């Protein structure tokens, strides 16, 4: 796919928690084609410690309003600076990058999208496209506590939402792989994004259940185009750059011990 470097205008910055913001961006021209699971590399201005662009998952593409949504966890100088953006500011973005999730091929297919923490970000757009295609989508979202759950109202507009929290403050207590939906329902595809230990557990469940599974890897990235080799992941096809060959990879290609 063709890549673009665009100066996108900030429409709004909404605080979703004390450490997460939702940034909505727009452009004068229609946004380019974007696949679910792809990401952007954003340039962070006014941060003396942030020389490299920051990779951010594409949370949603609102074609009706020509908006691109980015869900940002403010964990360092660069992302905290992004949280200070205001309406009318300009954010330089390189996009779309990487490969996306596999779309359903039949309307009878049932997809389970599993997200943990800010890893829920790419699942919103993916779920919307699955719904628009006519297939069935269920979300399984996990967090440490209820205040860490993000965009629940948006997910509920698309499909069934199942929740786990480690402290039991919302949904079922425990990790996502402990949720009863995994015992009570059958799925044709599981797609997941979040902390690696969570994705390993989800991949292990999928392999045991004989269900196709894709994971969206969150390796440390710099260039975003496969040049610097800092995001390399070992696969059955050799070392691959997560930014270029991923971030979405079928678990059959991974060398994880599952």
Regions found by a protein language model. Give the residues of each.
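Ferredoxin-reductase
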Residues: 2-87
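Short, basic/aromatic-enriched C-terminal tail that caps enzymatic domains
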Residues: 4, 239-258
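Structural signal for conserved beta-strand scaffold positions within catalytic alpha/beta enzyme cores
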Residues: 12, 60, 163-165, 215, ...
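Short, surface-exposed secondary-structure boundary micro-motifs
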Residues: 45-47, 96, 236
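Short, Lys/Arg- and Gly-enriched loop/turn segments at beta-strand edges
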Residues: 48-56, 98-105, 243
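FNR/FR-type flavoprotein reductase catalytic core
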Residues: 77-218
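Local cysteine-cluster metal-coordination motifs and their immediate loop/turn environment
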Residues: 196, 218-247
């Amino acid at each position: 796919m063709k890549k673009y470097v665009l100066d996108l205008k900030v429409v709004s910055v909404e605080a979703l928690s004390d450490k997460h913001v939702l940034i909505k961006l727009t452009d004068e021209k229609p946004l380019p084609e974007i696949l679910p699971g792809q990401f952007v590399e954003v340039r962070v201005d006014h941060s003396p410690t942030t020389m490299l662009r920051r990779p951010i998952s594409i949370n949603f593409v609102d074609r009706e309003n020509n908006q691109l949504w980015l869900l940002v966890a403010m964990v360092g100088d660069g992302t905290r600076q992004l949280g200070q953006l205001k309406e009318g500011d300009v954010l330089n973005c390189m996009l779309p990058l990487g490969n996306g999730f596999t779309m359903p091929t039949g309307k009878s297919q049932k997809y389970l999208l599993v997200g943990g923490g800010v890893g829920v970000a790419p699942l919103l757009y993916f779920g919307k496209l699955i719904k628009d295609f006519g297939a069935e989508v269920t979300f399984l979202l996990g967090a440490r506590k209820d205040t860490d759950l993000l965009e629940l109202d948006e997910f509920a507009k698309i499909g069934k939402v199942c929740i786990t929290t480690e402290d039991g403050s919302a949904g079922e207590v425990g990790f996502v792989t402990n949720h009863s939906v995994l015992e009570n329902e059958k799925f044709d595809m599981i797609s997941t994004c979040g902390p690696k230990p969570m994705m390993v557990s989800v991949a292990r469940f999928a392999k045991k259940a004989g269900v196709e599974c894709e994971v969206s890897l969150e390796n440390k990235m710099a260039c975003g185009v496969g040049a610097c080799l800092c995001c390399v992941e070992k696969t059955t096809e050799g070392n691959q750059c997560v930014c270029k060959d991923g971030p979405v990879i079928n678990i059959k290609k991974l060398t994880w011990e599952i």
